[in-house]
From Swiss-Prot:
Classification via CDD domains: Ribosomal_L13
The entry's keywords: Ribonucleoprotein, Ribosomal protein
UniProt-listed GO biological process terms: negative regulation of translation; translation
Family note: Belongs to the universal ribosomal protein uL13 family.
Pfam families per the UniProt record, alphabetical: Ribosomal_L13
InterPro entries: Ribosomal_uL13, Ribosomal_uL13_bac-type, Ribosomal_uL13_sf
A single MF term (Gene Ontology): structural constituent of ribosome
NCBIfam families: rplM_bact
GO cellular component assignments: cytosolic large ribosomal subunit
Lineage per the UniProt record: Bacteria, Pseudomonadati, Pseudomonadota, Gammaproteobacteria, Moraxellales
Name of protein: Large ribosomal subunit protein uL13
Gene3D superfamilies, per database record: Ribosomal protein L13 (3.90.1180.10)
Biological source species: Psychrobacter sp. (strain PRwf-1)
Role: This protein is one of the early assembly proteins of the 50S ribosomal subunit, although it is not seen to bind rRNA by itself. It is important during the early stages of 50S assembly.
Quaternary data: Part of the 50S ribosomal subunit.
Length: 142
């Protein structure tokens, strides 16, 4: 008996919608990362993109535990000497609410061409409105 390996042509990608309101950042991010990779499917193959599309709404209402709202730091670098910038969770959620969940999920995905293609299947929105009604996403309770 041979191990079945999924072919890219025979993989189906479903659309799911997740409401992030009141959900804990890390716990939600791990579930999303696993679904984006396709690890929940029996046909999971590490070198083939078998994951689903995930639409996240209310990304601005995501929660963190403890004092992480003030203490959690996010860094970025301009590429120039001395060009490192630092911000905390509260400031980042106020200016770019989608960026918080994007950084959390992106860090959990593999680096390389497959990981870069996988992160493109994550659609993040701060409010309840999203332009993906035509795909008829199914409600996913995480």
């Amino acid at each position: 008996m041979k191990t079945q390996s999924a072919k890219p042509a025979e993989v189906t990608h479903d659309w799911y919608i997740v409401d992030a309101e009141g959900k804990t950042l890390g716990r939600l991010a791990t579930q999303i990362a696993a679904r984006l990779r396709g690890k929940h499917k029996p046909s999971f193959t590490p070198h083939v993109d078998t994951g689903d599309y995930i639409v996240v709404i209310n990304a601005d209402k995501i929660a963190v535990t403890g004092k992480k709202a003030q203490d959690k730091k996010y860094y970025r670098h301009s590429g120039y000497p001395g060009g490192i910038k630092e911000t905390n969770f509260t400031k980042l959620i106020a200016h770019k609410p989608e960026e918080v969940l994007l950084k959390a999920v992106k860090g959990m995905l593999p680096k390389g061409p497959l990981g870069y293609a996988t992160i493109k299947k994550l659609k993040l929105y701060a409010g309840t409105e999203h332009p993906h009604a035509a795909q008829q996403p199914k409600e996913l309770d995480i």
